[in-house]
Amino acid sequence: MSEKHPGPLVVTGKLSDGERMKSQSNFLRGTIAEDLNDGLTGGFNGDNFLLIRFHGMYQQDDRDIRAERAEQKLEPRHAMMLRCRLPGGIITPQQWLGIDKFAADNTLYGSIRITNRQTFQFHGILKGNVKPAHQLLNQLGLDALATANDVNRNVLCTSNPVESVLHQEAYEWAKKISEHLLPRTRAYAEIWLDAEKVATTDEEPILGATYLPRKFKTTVVIPPQNDVDLHANDLNFVAVADKGKLVGFNVLVGGGLSIAHGDKNTYPRKASEFGYIPLQHTLAIAEAVVTTQRDWGNRTDRKNAKTKYTLERVGVEVFKAEVEKRAGVSFGAIKPYQFTGRGDRIGWVKGIDKKWHLTLFIENGRLLDYPGRSLKTGVAEIAKIHQGDFRLTANQNLIVAGVPEKDKARIEALAREHGLMDDSVSPQRENSMACVSFPTCPLAMAEAERFLPEFVTRIEGILQQHGLPDEHIVMRVTGCPNGCGRALLAEMGLVGKAVGRYNLHLGGNREGTRIPRMYRENITEDEILAITDQLVGRWAKERHTDEGFGDFVIRVGVIAPVIDSARDFYDVQEAV
């Protein structure tokens, strides 16, 4: 341990109740199977409420009608959100048609939600439809295993359709990493797929009998795009190419954005550079990072249990040395890499494989049929004729990938007919993102997805007023401090504090390599817009050529940059 990080390798003390729950779960089985047959409640009881998360589900209820149901002496309208495991975000048109039909027939909302972790979610699955949902995924060659709770979650991979060979190689590694780090328990197959129970003891050689201390997120990144927001993730493999071929990875560890309001022991953190590895060591390094965090992560306090806190407690060099020891691999010096942006290239691009790729902007990732814009039907119609694949992006958009020249006009016609292509969408709207929040998320403190569209319209008005209609601010809204909307890597981030109120963070950058600092606490939409109007006015007049909004507010002293978030994230800055 270093002088800067005198903390112990293992935190001792009373374990959190989550650890009890996992240890008593019989490798994630609990009594979920019995609970499925309990018709007296629409929800899962006791430990099962949390255990189902390991199976890719969250128990939710419609918060818009919660009080009304309570007055009627009814339990909340319980329904499950189910999240698919889809490493790298690639799904076939045939698979898509299967999930499209299920969403229409078996969910309360009828929508498909593309997430910023490159997968899709069903919202509003009633308890009786949960098992059929898992069985449908299995029939389609998919599953929901380990997309939530204390495991390695869905592995992201940069959506880069132009560099087709490099993307394919990176995507294959994302799949391998995902498979390697999956739970080995047979609980998922037994409960949902009616697999035969085998009279052997489960083993979890990588994750351990009580799994990880907290959720764990992994990415494969292809510079110069940082669409996956690597600094929001525990483990990152940054692709290093030679003549267009993947040869190895720079490894970065310990990023994460989740905080808790009022708890200064929680903070966002950028990932630390560990070094370079050739391809053949990828799985060994992934496993070593995960097992080190498994053994050293804080199991007494879930708010302090993520990899970022372990690194701060023991020190980056100590953690890195342990990873090298466990993997039997020494990191080389970091290879040069640079990020230039993280937005998706909306519209058509041609790959080096001569195929065309169409990126469709899906506001908030929500596919539903709206009056005059039948988005969900449109994607299904494209799926019926498309010969390539679909790619879900970390910006919640959808790429129709691998389109031959002869099909291009037909697919564009369908996209335009159903409102999936709209030339009037502004750069600001394309670079704004929100988490789901109300009405389904139980953690929501303020609106996010439902708030964003009209809020963006008002931001567009401010940009227009100051002569910047084609400019944009990377803007994120998250309904609570858990950070699903990745607001703490935005140029302007809104973090929900209470209904109608947000903490406003400024000073991130377009590349996603700087954490924004809180500028105002607990303010209303109108207050945020007044501040934005003032600052955009200055930006329009005083900015340097091609200077982004986040870089500008730091350069002119509106706010100080976050340099070392574990120590300076909460420093109070006098606003200019």
Swiss-Prot record:
Entry keyword Amino-acid biosynthesis: yes
Annotated binding of siroheme, by residue: C484
* E.C. number(s) listed in UniProt: 1.8.1.2
The catalysed reaction is: hydrogen sulfide + 3 NADP(+) + 3 H2O = sulfite + 3 NADPH + 4 H(+)
Q: Does the keyword Iron apply?
A: yes
Record's PROSITE patterns?
A: NIR_SIR
Q: How does it assemble?
A: Alpha(8)-beta(8). The alpha component is a flavoprotein, the beta component is a hemoprotein.
Record-given protein name? Sulfite reductase [NADPH] hemoprotein beta-component
Q: Which organism is it from?
A: Yersinia enterocolitica serotype O:8 / biotype 1B (strain NCTC 13174 / 8081)
